[in-house]
Regions:
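Cleavable N-terminal export/targeting peptides
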Residues: 1-25
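Alpha-helical transmembrane segments
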Residues: 4-8, 160, 201
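Short N-terminal segments immediately surrounding and downstream of signal-peptide cleavage
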Residues: 23-38
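Membrane-spanning beta-strand positions in outer-membrane beta-barrel proteins
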Residues: 25-27, 79-81, 126-128, 169, ...
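Gram-negative (and chloroplast) outer-membrane scaffold detector with strong preference
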Residues: 34-38, 63-145, 201-211
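Predominantly the C-terminal beta-signal and adjacent terminal strand-loop region
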Residues: 37-45, 50-53, 89-95, 162, ...
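A charged, solvent-exposed segment within the mature domains of Sec-exported extracytoplasmic proteins
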Residues: 130-177
Length: 211
């Protein structure tokens, strides 16, 4: 629920841009992708126990929403854009089973990326490449459940990123594309424990609607 509230606030802020803007400079998008998310602490727990363990690494898969606005530069072909979104990653789960205790660890992460980019818009029925840079706010939570008791720990971090991609504009209203992103120093630690590590490359399939 908190993630939906955060997304709603962020999209409302971006959509509060002057309403006199040209109609097709606004956009909203969805994406599905895969990125780095190494559950290092869970692996250390797994390596350090003599009991039965089961580690499910699903935290690299993510889905996201975004809102964007593009300024026309010297003409309608060259554009400077800004976009703000929310990416929600899958869970990493570790189960430890002992003769008397059932122990479960779950790691969840979401990110709020803000990106400024340049795009070469070649119109309908053509590819439009773009490159950009920005910052991402990451929040990771590590939850432990033992015999009905629950303990949570979380940490946040802001990191820089680079981004590049291209989209094919099927109509004035819709484009489908591919996007790559590189996060710098996105290892999220607390008290020496690595809650998640999103440093490195990620890629996504994007769908955007312009209006």
């Amino acid at each position: 629920m908190r993630k939906l509230v955060v997304l709603g606030v962020l999209l409302s802020i971006l959509c509060a841009w002057p309403t006199a803007a040209k109609a097709d400079n606004w956009g909203i998008g969805v994406k599905v992708g895969v990125g780095e998310n190494d559950p290092k602490t869970m692996k250390e727990i797994q390596d350090g126990t003599l009991y039965n363990t089961e580690l499910n690494e699903n935290g690299a898969v993510f889905s996201g929403l975004e809102a964007l606005y593009e300024f026309n530069l010297d003409d309608e072909t060259n554009k400077l854009g800004v976009k703000l979104g929310v990416d929600v990653f899958g869970h990493n789960d570790l189960k430890v089973t002992t003769p008397s205790v059932w122990d479960k660890w779950t790691e969840t992460t979401y990110a709020i990326p803000l990106t400024v980019y340049y795009k070469r818009d070649n119109g309908v029925s053509a590819w439009a490449p773009y490159v950009g840079a920005g910052v991402s706010f990451f929040r990771s939570e590590l939850k432990r459940e033992v015999i009905g008791d629950e303990v949570k720990d979380h940490k946040s971090k802001i990191v820089p990123h680079l981004m590049a991609g291209a989209e094919y504009r099927f109509t004035k209203l819709f484009a489908l594309g591919l996007e790559a992103k590189y996060n710098f120093g996105a290892k999220i630690k607390k008290d020496g424990d690595v809650l998640s590590d999103h440093s490195g490359f990620g890629g996504a399939i994007t769908g955007r609607f312009y209006f």
